[in-house]
Amino acid sequence: MEEPMEVDNKRPKVLTWTEKYRPKTLDDIAYQDEVVTMLKGALQGRDLPHLLFYGPPGTGKTSAALAFCRQLFPKNIFHDRVLDLNASDERGIAVVRQKIQSFSKSSLGHSHREDVLKLKIIILDEVDAMTREAQAAMRRVIEDFSKTTRFILICNYVSRLIPPVVSRCAKFRFKSLPAEIQVQRLRTICDAEGTPMSDDELKQVMEYSEGDLRRAVCTLQSLAPILKSGDDNARNCYLRGSSDSLLISNVCKSILTADVPQIIALTKDITKSCTGVAFIRRCFQQLMDEDVINDENIGVMGKLVATCEKRILDGCDLENNLLDFLLTLRETIQ
C-alpha cells in the first residue's frame, strides 16, 4: 500500500503581482480623487449610497471598492459583511437568487465596536456582463434590502446597464491613468522585485497594455524572469510586442510620399520590429492625433483597422496584411 504523499503546508503563498501590489487603503488609489473623497466621507460616518464605478479597465475600480471595505470593517467580520462576486462568471438570474439574495437576507454579524457601520456590502464586478433579466432581479433586491445592504457595482460600460439599476446608484467615473502615474507605479514594482528596466522599456510595456495598469503589471511579471536572466536577445524580442515608436513615426511621416516599393520595404521593417496588431492600432492613433485623417475618413479607417486586426488574429499572413493596410491607408488619406 502506498504511503500518502506529504503536503508542505509551510510553503509560502505565491501571489500574482496584481494582487501583491493591489492598493490596500484608499490613500493608495491613484488619480481618482473624487471617488476617494466620497469613500473617506463614508468612513467618517456620512451616508453611504449604492455606488456604481465605471470606466476603462485597470483604473482601480475593484481596488477602490476592496480598500474601502477593508477600512470599513475589522478583519474578524470582513467576510461576514462583504460579498465579492464577478458577474462575468455567472451572468444569469441564478446568481441573484442564490448568492446575492441569500447574502442580503442573512443577519448582520456582531461586532464589539460601536463605530462599525451596521451594513453589509455586495461588490459586484463586471456587472455589465449580466443579462437584462438578472439586472432586473438585482434591482428588486437593491430595493428590498436597502436598510441592511449596500451595493458597489463595477463595470466598464455603463450603457449596458438597465436604467432602473443606474438610477439607484451614485455614479463615479474612473479616469484613465496618465502615462507618468503608470510608469511611476511600474517603477515602484520593479524596484521592489529587483527587476532592471529603463523608463523607456516601462513606457513600451505601458503602451502595449493600452492604459490598463493591471495588464501592464501582468506583462511586467511575465517579463521579469527574462530581464533577470540578462539575455538581451530575449529581452528585445519580448519588448517588440509593444511597437517601436520611432518606426511608427517614420511610417506616419512617409506614408503620403512613399511609392509602392518603399511601402513594401517599410512593411518588411515593421514585420521584423513590431507585432502587427500593436502597430496597426498605434499607427492609426498617431495619425488621428496629428489630424492626418479627416472626419470623413475616420469611419473608413476604423473599418480598415478592424478588418486587418481580425485577419492577423485569425492567422492570415502578417506581411501581406500590413502591406494591404499601408496601401489602403495611403489611398484613403491622399
From Swiss-Prot:
Assigned GO CC terms: DNA replication factor C complex; nucleus
Gene3D superfamilies assigned: 1.10.8.60, P-loop containing nucleotide triphosphate hydrolases
Positions bound to ATP: G55, P56, P57, G58, T59, G60, K61, T62
BP terms from Gene Ontology: DNA repair; DNA replication; DNA-templated DNA replication
Coarse class of the protein's main subcellular location: nucleus
Places the protein is found: Nucleus
GO molecular function: ATP binding; ATP hydrolysis activity
Pfam families listed in its UniProt record: AAA, RCF1-5-like_lid
Subunit-level organization: Heteropentamer of various rfc subunits that forms a complex (RFC) with PCNA in the presence of ATP.
Task of the protein: The elongation of primed DNA templates by DNA polymerase delta and epsilon requires the action of the accessory proteins PCNA and activator 1. This subunit may be involved in the elongation of the multiprimed DNA template.
Record-stated family: Belongs to the activator 1 small subunits family.
This protein's name: Replication factor C subunit 4
Species assigned in the record: Caenorhabditis elegans
